[in-house]
Amino acid sequence: MIGLVDGNNFYVSCERVMNPKLNGKPVAVLSNNDGCCVAMSPEFKALGIARGTPYYQLKDREVPKGNLIFCSSNYELYGDISRRIIQVLRERAVEVEQYSIDEAFIWPPSVAGNREQGLGNRDWYLEYGKSVRAQVLQWVGIPCGVGFAKTKTLAKIANHIGKKLPEGVFVMPDDPTDILAKLPTDEVWGVGRRLPLKLRAERIFTAKDLRDAPDDLVRSVGGVTLLRMATELRGVPCNQDRDYSADPDSVSCSRSFGEQITTMDALMESIASFTAQAATKLRRHGMLATGCNVYAQVAVPGMFKVSPEQREPRSGGYQGCGGGWDSSFYGYTVTFPEPTDATNVMVRAIHEQIGSLFVKGAKYRKSGIVFFGLEKVGAAYQADLFAPAEKREKSKLYVAIDALNVRLGKGKVFSAAEGVGKPAWAMKRSKLSKRATTNWDELLTVR
């Protein structure tokens, strides 16, 4: 049996931990730059407001029990509370595999090291789940749902059911046919939004239909990935050994600006800041980057002409159904003399080509950086014979800087290239709650 622990309305629950006055009130957490609602309390959902509704449409709205309450995304707080939940789970389970900021798979003591074990005593798992849920609530303050099943895919379904139960825990029965028959395919973990259309064309409407479909048909519709999901719906583990904490293939950082940028200095400051943040992630993973892609987005697509090489190809979140080019994104590629994790080396190399990204008169709304060609620190690579000796040695400078920023607060020590003071382009978080668990200057006051 494998369990899935998932924080209920996680962002809102984190806000309520630090401000109990929000309990029982309609609360929503906003996206970057206070754009739209990304997390909502049950009271907020009960008003019929859809997730993703823009903030400007709701900020002056009155409801019968008082005004709506909005909070800016407090990522520092959410990340710290997530870490605390994982610590509690590691106290109770022999194996813990974090899947996202608010979800983690757990293997209870009775099955750790024996993942093929069947359901066993369902009552034991039910009581164990209640105990784990109660401990997370008491120690961290976050309400959770817990689901147990033979596979990760079934555990996700069990968790979804458990969240709706008073006890917050559900153990999948040996034969989940009745449950799967009521579950649409678009609610199955990992199916996404596009595959259900293809599945319906093959008369596969529910999770039960997907489970019972022939392997060849499933593979033809969604490849090996969908076949694994179907196999897991049959109770046969396929994704048990996936490591969600494995080394990344790339590391990135990007933000939409609070105000549009019109100067090269401001554009360079934003890119230097995002480079520093991404480099910190690199060092945390113990990785070096061989190069990076730098890009920026203008407010008016196609407002000026650039060479084809300067256009940023659609990738990741920017790629449309047909691929191709996005005329609002422009960028360039930098290859470092040798793999590095040193922020100053990266910023210097990026700065040399920033002129190719900036055009006078353009208004920029976003910038970002993606490190690629990642290698483990200590791995063998071809060094640059002409590089200064100090570049080939592992510098302790950024180890010390990272340690200081952990101890004193994020961004306390930074490079001058990032600019001094809060820039106009910084992300808007006008309704930010206190970062009381990670910032000494924002500790809560007890009266």
Label every PLM stretch briefly.
Residues P143-G145, N293, G368:
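Residues at or immediately flanking beta-strands
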Residues F105-S110, Y330-P337, K376, Y381-A387:
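Short, hydrophobic beta-strand segments
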Residues V345-V347, H351-R407:
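C-terminal hydrophobic structural anchor segments
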Residues V169-M172, T185, V251, F257, ...:
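Short clusters of hydrophobic/aromatic residues that line enzyme substrate/ligand-binding pockets
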Residues Y99-E103, A149-K152, M287-G291, A362-K366:
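Short Gly/Ser/Thr- and Asp/Glu-enriched loop/turn motifs at secondary-structure junctions
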Residues L195-K363, R447:
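DNA-contacting surface of Y-family translesion DNA polymerases
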Residues M1-R234, Q240-R242, T280, A389-R447:
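Gly/Gly-Pro- and Ser/Thr-rich, intrinsically disordered tail segments characteristic of DNA damage-repair
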Residues S31, V63-P64, V298-V300, G378:
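Short acidic-glycine loop/turn motifs at beta-strand connectors
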